[in-house]
From Swiss-Prot:
Pfam families in alphabetical order: TLC
Gene that produces this protein: tlcD
GO molecular function terms attached to this record: ATP binding; ATP:ADP antiporter activity
Protein name (database record): ADP,ATP carrier protein 4
Main location: membrane
């Protein structure tokens, strides 16, 4: 009788153990958790798919039917105060209603508005809005208020933009994550959350593919049902009908989670709470001023917000030269979303290896370098005809406007992909070696000041320029924006270098 040496070296139990480890790595969900994980996954998928569709739609409507310049006004004068108002309403609801009912109420309000917009407001927007003659007379008499008049004259488009912007903050960040964090243990979260991250990027890709094929879907629906609606009205109705269907699925999924999937033990944990004594703006400033480490993290957040917004405005304005209708623009945004999803998954795979093999600084500096290099390329093509001509001579593209749009899209795809992975992870790593009190309070301070100043600060500056110079456009102020962009990115790179020193010192002291 002969004994196979390979069986001695690799007995079945050892092979099974290796296989088990591999399957646990790929699919770390335990058998009794499968239904819970899948229902949470379905809920997240519906919410994120809706989020990507309405984000694309709001930009398509406002950019093509009002003007790209108005986006900065909407972000600062519309979205920011609405977010504060929504937070105040939410705190009131928490004290008066059950967590489950709050979810149903808020989701239902969003869906009711989207249904109203799709089937009542948008088809009749010409009747509901001020006439072009009235708008022209008002802007002639109140030239410095031109952009505010345009937004108010097309109030329903402005309102749709604001409501769509609130969805990710209210429904996804607040309702969804608060629910999931309350029903998920720390041990489960380590296995669930990485898969959630991968899923979210899949949702971006699928939403992008849907929008890219919107014209074909529109043609199919028109021929199938012999509809007489205008092409663009039907496109908007198709998108928002999908939103409504997904919203109903999300509500049903949430109900099943609460009543069929989760046990009583889980449900006892479920109670939405207003955050305990969150830091005021003044307290946040004090915390940032008292710690150089936190000050540098806040600088990174501010610079990211400003840099991205400085490029996005002119890029969207350039896109309207070629994509002149909401349907065309939505398809263009769909293509951009698809690539963002693919590249983010790629960065997720590469990100952990970069940090592990090359260190914190290399991983942290990639995002500002990507934003800086691609942003400079975009502004160069957008502002200097000679540079655009040089690219035309060497590449297939022959239209300067199309070159600017393509480079702007590449800039946005790579910037967002690296931000979602490398920037966010290295920023969170920078808090780890800090003293526990500074870690908690410092993170709250940097998030409040950094995020708010980055997004709203850039929007405020741009809107201020358009108020002072009402005849200005993104094209006419593009060189000024480029100079601010360069200063912002250089500051960002400097802050990353300095934070690396602080990070290393903090690690030494914590050991």
């Amino acid at each position: 009788m002969t004994i196979n040496s390979s069986n001695i070296e690799n007995p079945p139990s050892k092979i099974n153990s290796r296989f088990s480890k591999l399957t646990d790595y790929i699919w770390p969900i335990k058998r009794h958790e499968v239904s819970k994980f899948l229902f949470i996954t379905l809920l997240m998928f519906c919410i994120l798919f809706i989020q990507n569709l309405i984000r694309a739609l709001k930009d398509s409507i406002v950019t093509t039917m009002i003007g790209a310049e108005t986006i900065s006004f909407l972000k600062f004068w519309g979205v920011m105060p609405s977010a504060f108002l929504m937070t105040a309403i939410y705190v009131k609801l928490v004290n008066r209603m059950k967590a489950e009912n709050i979810f149903y109420l808020i989701i239902s309000i969003f869906l009711a508005f989207f249904a109203l917009f799709a089937y009542v407001i948008f088809p009749n927007h010409e009747i509901l809005h001020l006439s072009p003659v009235t708008v022209q007379n008002l802007t002639a008499n109140l030239l410095n208020l031109k952009w505010f008049i345009l937004l108010l004259s097309k109030w329903s488009f402005s309102l749709f933009y604001i409501i769509a912007e609130l969805w990710p903050n209210v429904v996804f960040a607040l309702l969804f994550w608060q629910f999931v964090n309350n029903i998920t243990t720390v041990e489960e979260s380590k296995r669930f959350y990485p898969l959630f991250g991968l899923l979210s990027q899949t949702g971006i890709y699928l939403a992008g593919q849907f929008l890219e094929n919107l014209s074909n879907i529109n043609d199919y629906v028109t021929n199938k049902f012999a509809l007489q609606s205008s092409f663009h009205t039907l496109s908007i109705q198709i998108i928002l009908t999908i939103v409504l269907i997904l919203g109903i699925i999300a509500i049903k999924t949430f109900w099943l989670l609460n009543h069929k999937v989760l046990d009583k033990e889980h449900m006892a944990l479920l109670k939405f709470k207003a955050k305990k004594k969150s830091m005021t703006i003044a307290e946040s400033f004090q915390m940032i001023l008292s710690s150089r480490h936190i000050r540098l993290i806040a600088t990174l957040l501010i610079c990211y917000g400003i840099a991205i917004n400085l490029v996005e405005g002119p890029w969207k304005a350039a896109a309207t030269k070629i994509y002149k209708t909401p349907t065309e623009y939505a398809a263009f945004i769909g293509s951009y979303l698809s690539y963002t999803g693919v590249f983010t998954i790629l960065f997720v795979v590469l990100g952990s290896n970069i940090v592990r093999r090359l260190g914190w600084f290399t991983a942290a500096v990639i995002t500002p370098l990507i934003v800086f290099i691609t942003g400079i390329l975009f502004f160069a093509v957008n502002n200097f005809e000679g540079f655009a001509g040089l690219i035309i001579a060497n590449f297939i593209l022959t239209d300067p406007a199309l070159i600017a749009i393509t480079i702007g899209a590449i800039q946005n795809v790579l910037s967002k992909s690296s931000k979602y992975t490398l920037f966010d992870s290295t920023k969170e790593m920078a808090y780890v070696p800090l003293d526990p009190e500074i870690k908690i309070k410092g993170k709250a301070a940097a998030d409040v000041i950094g995020t708010k100043l980055g997004k709203s600060g850039s929007a405020f500056l741009q809107s201020l320029v358009f108020i002072i110079l009402p005849s200005a456009s993104y094209q006419s102020i593009s060189i000024c924006l480029m100079i601010i962009f360069i200063i912002t990115c250089l500051t960002w790179l400097w802050a990353t270098k300095e934070l690396n020193k602080e990070y290393k010192n903090s690690i030494k002291f914590s050991q």
